[in-house]
Amino acid sequence: MSLNVRTLDFWQIIVLALSILIFCPLIALILISFGDSEGLWGHLLETVLIRYVKTTLFLMAGVSLFSLLFGIISAWILTNYEFRFSKVLEVLMLLPLACPAYLVAYAYTDFFEYAGPVQGFIRGLMGWKTASDYIFPEIRSLGGAIFVLSSVLYPYIYLLSRTAFRETPNSYYEVAQLYNRNIFWSVSLPLARPAIVAGLALVCMEVVSDFGTVEYFALETLTLGIFNVWIGMNNINAAAQISTFTFIFILMLLLVEIRSRAGKRFNDTSSRQTNKKAKLITGIEAFFCIAGCLIPVSLGFFIPILILLSNALTSLNFHNYYEVTKIFTNTLIISSIGAFCIMGVSTIIACTAYLSGKKYLRTVANFSASGYAFPGTMLAIGILVFIGFVDRTLDLFSSADSTFYLSGTIFMLIFAYIVKFQAVGYGAVLSGLTKTSPNLIWASRTLGMSFHKTISRITIPLIKKSIIAGGVLAFVDIMKELPITLLLRPFDFETLATFTYQFAHDELMGKASVPALLIILVGLIPVIFLNKILRTNI
């Protein structure tokens, strides 16, 4: 059913304009990649580009392997077995989602490096004096990055695997047992494969997009290559060309994720559509199950938290806390403004596209939400180029001396957040709309209420909880965002993420720990929301 009303046509134009505006930075990025890189692209192709690709692929492969092991094993244990603390572990398994990978990297580097407590304890215990007396794995390495990213990203696979395992009807297991087949390999894993692949695609997108961890560990990935060429070599055209190359990686992963979601359907036509009951276990079996779940969550949450807390307590500095409070206020303000703008734009786009019933409008709306999949360094180039074009256009109609109207301002940073995180708000609003009965909306239209009044008086109150949830998620994502804020922030403007980054790079982990803990503390909010949703729906 469609709302073919003149007022709706106006809102359709608004949606098209907003979607095009959000997509403009990616278009600008592609256009500038055709510019002259002064021979640097050819030089990069001959020297480091292959290394960037290899490192990115090895990192993706390693993180994928360990994320699969952590996620699938823990999901299988908590779905099929019931033991003491199993319900608590279901909640704890999602906690690493609250920790940005770069903060975990900072914590583990401080913990495992030569001057850290682990190697110091080993040297004291064994009587060793120098680094040449023993061999210890280097945390700032490809293996270290795989370890850090896997411990933080496995919840994507855990969450989708657990949902798929729990939705498998018991009748499937009964048939497998009848034919004496292993239920995990013959039933659960094949049926959960689309969900697992979708989670794996999300993990790989996060790996490709990661900046903080790979930059701190000095790993030459595509994302860090974009940053180095742009900032280090001052060649934005060559950086855009690497970004376009990375664009292909992202599109392939998006295609895999979309195809996996499309195949994530199976039906039980029997009359008994009950789910398999968890088996009650005790003793040594329960011990190993608890250990299997505690290992990943400890690596991704508890150990980094304890390291950061220890650093914060051993370097108390009230002047530093005053500075942190000031920057925390900055972060709250910019995150609140960004979240408000994101939810406003998302609500307009999602409501109009969904209620119009027009396929092309929904397609455009979906494209406007694609920015979340792309690395922050890549989007920053596109946004800077696009805003620069807008500034030059405004300069043609202005008599002011300055040519920087929007560049280097809070407005540009807010716009960058909208481009990056609009998918978060759009997904939340769309989820609320699909759960709302359309009859109330059609009834209001039948009674003569205009489209915008229907949206404001009927639709928005019905999806208010979804809008709030989306706003909270967007707020936390903005608060944790590092590369976009670092590259596009106004002069002398700090957030908790950039503040932590500066201190970590100066090897001042005591000062970096307090803002890092604040980021993680706020990051727990969406995890709490997620657990409430899971308890309601599963």
Describe the function of each predicted region:
Residues 208-234, 404, 482-509:
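Glycine-rich helix-loop "coupling/hinge" segments at transmembrane-helix boundaries
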Residues 6-36, 47-166, 191-211, 241-258, ...:
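Membrane-water interface segments at the C-terminal ends of transmembrane alpha-helices
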Residues 36-52, 215-217, 222-237, 312-324, ...:
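Membrane-interface interhelical loops and short amphipathic "cap" helices
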Residues 168-171, 436-440:
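Short glycine/proline-centered loop/turn elements that form peptide/ligand docking sites
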Residues 182, 449-450:
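Short coil/turn motifs that cap or connect alpha-helices
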Residues 178, 532-538:
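Short, charged juxtamembrane terminal tails flanking transmembrane helices
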Residues 175-177, 444:
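The alpha-helix within a helix-turn-helix
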